[in-house]
Amino acid sequence: MNLPSIIRRSADAARVAAEQNAAWLQGHMSPFFFMAMEDELEALAALAREMGRLRNNRHLILTDQDKRLVIACVNGPGSLYDTLRRVGDREISYAMFSHSDESMPGIGDELEVQRLEFDRRHNHEIDLQRAVEIPAALLRKVRAELRCSFPDFDLTKLDRLLKILWLNNENYIRMSPPSRTAYLIWLFDKGNASGGLFLDLSLVEREGRSETRVLFAVGNPPQEEFLLQLLEVFNRLEIAIRRAYCQTISNGIHPYFLGAFYVSGRQGENIHPSGKLADLLKRELCTTQIISTSTQAYKDYVVEGLLSGEDASLVNAFIAFCHTSLAHAQPDRFGLEDFQTAFYDHPEMAQLLIRLFRLRFDPDQVGRELLYGQALAEAREAVEAYNTGHRWLDDIRRAVYRCCLLFVTHTLKTNFFVIEKQALAFRLDPAYLRQLGKEFIADIPETPPFRITFFFSRFGAGYHIGFSDIARGGWRTVIARSADDYITSASTIFREVYVLANTQHLKNKDIYEGGSKMALVLDASDLDQAGGEAENCRLYKLQYGIANAFLDIFITENGRARDRRIVDYYGDDEPIEIGPDENMHDGMIEAIASLSRKRGYILGVGIMSSKRFGINHKEYGVTSIGVVAFAEITMAEVAGIDLRRDPFSLK
């Protein structure tokens, strides 16, 4: 045996194979792929040398570092999804996926390359006052691309948005073609303008081929497994991702997800933006803001293809409403698990109620009155006939199903069929309370309210209750930092809001505005640090998402909900004023007021008190904070005493 000769022959064969593979890669991978991999030449060389090993291996690891992972694999249904599941809870800052347009020679399957980076910037690192040097030539090219591709874009925003992207990932901006940077800036701006949620599907041309591009922007996205959840949507809908570029950046206040997906059907067919599949994709992508991956509805029903994400979010809203409606009066009889098992263990009952809800509120429903009447009779019969032979459990579950039935029949309008939503809102006729049963309302004041609105979000739920048409009152958020705290707070939140709103109504007896109150429970039980950055981001997501949902249903035109995807059984304007209360930070006050004005609510910025302009009721004695402020001012002016530093006595 002449080993050196064998090695030389093997090396020659490997060199020839690598050159052939390199030529194949050059011809069958997107030009954008090579731009995205410009800083990974060793990984590209390794791919050319080793590509043939994919005949017998599922993956080739091309780069494996603390902050970067590059993998080559055989393209197959769910391959991206499987990789992200293996990555686990590592925070992804950048993800790039790209497929070949032809099967690999001698293998018979397409090539897929996945690049993941784990280098997220924290909010405090994005300092817009910091000087950065963005190449003038790059700035000119991006500006020209924006003028050409997005003529409506306000170019005065370019410097600020590009600087944010640069501070987050300078290397990506340097390597990206100006066209990609331009649409990234446009997408970032659209996300901001749309209240933190924007989705665009369009057919685009590339090298003479049309393909479907999905652009998705999410302000303050869910932090755990969000990209995995998005890929689960594509996988479940049998949509193939040909290539994708996704970033999670920080705007200095909270994270921001910016994603571009180039997709097709599993057989390579285009997905038309106005088609049924595209509509379903839009709904499911936006529902990722509402359905949590940790819930049983998601894990056992959505992932398994038994429920859509939309329907699962509705089931979770059913559970939250029934829990908050029944448990406050009888906490020993009704625990959270009783409501969960009523729906999760009996999906046939959940499906009946989902169908009834859809028949009542689907804006495109034909023959609504007849079909809804039939479905209502069927649902009522199923609820009353529910019997498993376990009397104690049957009584509990019938009470739960009756409550849910009242929820569906007494909701007057909802934003459920609005696609671009971050939370669910349900405006109810309070008459349902009289039908709940005396045992469930014995612990609340007898005076019936004028309106009840229920809100449900990925991270919490709560109510707004008003005792007159024109009403005002504060908005407080209870932060539950343990599972026990959340269950306890959620169990009593309805009674708390009801009593506070009724008390406010009595206080307002001498003015034209009736009393109201809004309170939410935030689930922060899985977060490590109380009051930390992650908790604040979640608090802002809950509040801003529910503010948007509030405006979805209460913005009207000629007395009807302006958004025609909302079936409105109430049909009148509802001027509701909100004041800040517990855990409503100054920045959120300004954000909600600005959002209300931009979206065209009847009260404009008047929706929220204690803004920077006008009379700030935190400073003028309307709240406990205001009382302290009054005391500070009085002591300083009358006695020359600094209430916070100087010793003093009261006589």
What kind of region is each of these model predictions?
Residues 1-239, 243-458, 477-490, 534-538, ...:
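Non-catalytic interaction/regulatory segments
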Residues 230, 234, 249, 627, ...:
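Extended, hydrophobic alpha-helical segments in both membrane/secreted and soluble proteins
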